[in-house]
Curated annotation (Swiss-Prot):
Catalytic activity: D-ribulose 5-phosphate + ATP = D-ribulose 1,5-bisphosphate + ADP + H(+)
CC per GO annotation: chloroplast; cytoplasm
InterPro entries per the UniProt record, alphabetical: P-loop_NTPase, PRK, PRK/URK
Main location as per UniProt: plastid
Record protein name field: Phosphoribulokinase, chloroplastic
Paired cysteines (S-S): C67-C106
Species of the source: Spinacia oleracea
Pathway: Carbohydrate biosynthesis; Calvin cycle
Organism lineage: Eukaryota, Viridiplantae, Streptophyta, Embryophyta, Tracheophyta
Amino acid sequence: MAVCTVYTIPTTTHLGSSFNQNNKQVFFNYKRSSSSNNTLFTTRPSYVITCSQQQTIVIGLAADSGCGKSTFMRRLTSVFGGAAEPPKGGNPDSNTLISDTTTVICLDDFHSLDRNGRKVEKVTALDPKANDFDLMYEQVKALKEGKAVDKPIYNHVSGLLDPPELIQPPKILVIEGLHPMYDARVRELLDFSIYLDISNEVKFAWKIQRDMKERGHSLESIKASIESRKPDFDAYIDPQKQHADVVIEVLPTELIPDDDEGKVLRVRMIQKEGVKFFNPVYLFDEGSTISWIPCGRKLTCSYPGIKFSYGPDTFYGNEVTVVEMDGMFDRLDELIYVESHLSNLSTKFYGEVTQQMLKHQNFPGSNNGTGFFQTIIGLKIRDLFEQLVASRSTATATAAKA
C-alpha cells in the first residue's frame, strides 16, 4: 500500500534521510492566476509528495531483561531467510539487527536516561520515567509509514546514550524490549504482539547465565538487580501480557516432584482467539481438551519424559487456545512425529518446523518447548505477514478501480 505525504520544500530539510529507496517523490509548484486575462501566475513555494511503496508491518515482543528475546529474534529472522546482523559500518555496540526482510529494534534505545542518570534519579530502566515514549511512538510510526529515522542507541557496555543510527523502513519491523505494549499509541501500531512470560525461578537461572557469561556481571550484582527491578516489573512490564496476541509462558516442570534445578521446563503457548490473520495452533482435535504422552516407539524419551496438553481457556478475560509442552526432546529429528499431530502450523511443507529446529539446534531452548513454540510463532508471523501484504494489495487494487 502506498502511503503519501505532502511537504513544502522549506519544511523538508529537517527530514534529512527520510527519503529513501522505498519512496517516490513528485515535485510541483503551486500556481495562481494573477489577472482576469489568464496571464500566468506567480510561482509559489514548491511542494513534494513522498509516497512509500510499502507499509511496514510491525511486530512487538515484550519481556524482561534476560528472558530469551534475542534467541527468539534469531529464530524469527531465520524463518524469513538471511542472517540478521548489526548495521554495516555502524556503531559496533548497536542493538539493531537487520536481515533482508526484517529489522529488529531494541527498545532500550529509547531510554531517556543513561545508567548514571538512572542512579541519580533513583529509577530503573523499567520505570516509564526512564524512557522516551513520545520518540518511540514517532519513530515506530514513521517506519511503519515507510520513512527512515535517526534512532538513538543505548550502549549496554558503557551504559551511555550513543549518537543515533539511520534505520531504513523494512518489510517487517520487530520492536523488542521492556515496553512495546505499555504505551497505547505504540500498541496501536502493532500488527501482532508476543509476550515472553518467564517464571521467577526460571528467570533467575537464565539471567545468571547471560549476565555473568556475556556481560561480566557478578552473581551479587545480578541478585541485587533482580530484587531492585521486581516492583517495577510487576507494575509496568507484567501487565502488558494482557494485550499480547500470544503469550509464551515458561514454568518449572511438573514431571519431577519438587524440582529446583530448573533444567526441565513446562512451556505454555497461550493464543488469543479472534486475532485477524492468525489461526491458533491445536493438537489432534480443535476445541477438545487433550493430554498426550507421545513417548514410545516413534519418540525417544529419557527421564522424565514428555507430556503435551491442549485445550481452550480464558486469559485476562479473553478466550484463548493453549498448547503446552512439559519435558525435553532427546532427538530433534524425531520431532516430526509431534509436528505431524499439530494443525494450523502455517508451514510451507511437511516437516518445516523440524527442519528449523534442526537448523538451530545449538540455540538455547532447542530441546524444549521454548524453542519449539518460538519456531512455530515465527512461521505464524510469516503467514500473517503474507496475508497482510495480500490484503493491502487487494485493498489498493479495489480503491484504484473505484
